[in-house]
Design a protein with these regions (language model features):
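Hydrophobic alpha-helical membrane segments
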Residues: 1-183
Length: 183
């Protein structure tokens, strides 16, 4: 769900900046930017709703709204993003060749596909610049205090078992624990 929050937040932020170039009123561009992030993510969620593999998720929809709301609330309150949501990613290479094969199959072989699909390689960050809350302090403006969350051991949507169209198991790594980790 963190990915939904981050996506809606980021899309809202980019769209508000695009609307800034048009010269429209500050409040209008904040709201249009925020609604753009929410609308874009809602369209994706609607498409998921018609997919037999995914289906509609109220939790995903709520996370989308939270991401856009986080952006809008900060812009309206502070005219800046004091609490920023960020993403880092890298291509994972496993010592077990079967995991590399499975990763190539479900996440893709090239970097853009992997950046989009491989949750094992993501770390989501929430970063706060203390100086923005305490402007008279001697803290450096560049300092950010961050908390990150990532996941490991995910080689399928809901489990580490994959079946072909006939229901035959073609990949079974139920021995690999799926877990979250904090940074």
């Amino acid at each position: 769900k963190v990915g939904h929050v981050l996506s809606a937040y980021s899309i809202s932020k980019v769209n508000m900046e695009l609307w800034r170039w048009t010269g429209i009123d500050r409040n209008k561009r904040i709201w249009i930017g925020g609604m753009s992030g929410a609308a874009y993510q809602t369209v994706i969620e609607l498409l998921d709703g018609f997919s037999s593999e995914w289906g509609w998720s109220w939790a995903d929809f709520g996370a989308n709204m939270l991401g856009s709301s986080t952006f809008v609330a900060q812009e309206l309150a502070w005219n800046e993003q004091r609490i920023q949501l960020k993403l880092s990613s890298h291509k994972k290479i496993y010592s077990d060749e079967s995991l590399n094969f499975r990763s190539d199959k479900i996440f893709g072989k090239n970097v853009p596909e992997r950046l989009l699909k491989d949750y094992n390689a993501y770390t989501y960050w929430i970063s706060v610049a203390p100086k923005s809350f305490f402007p008279k302090s001697k803290l450096p403006a560049w300092l950010q205090v961050s908390l990150g969350i990532g996941a490991e051991g995910m080689f399928g949507a809901r489990s580490n078992i994959a079946k072909d169209k006939f229901g035959n198991i073609i990949f079974d790594r139920s021995d690999i624990q799926r877990y979250r980790q904090w940074y």
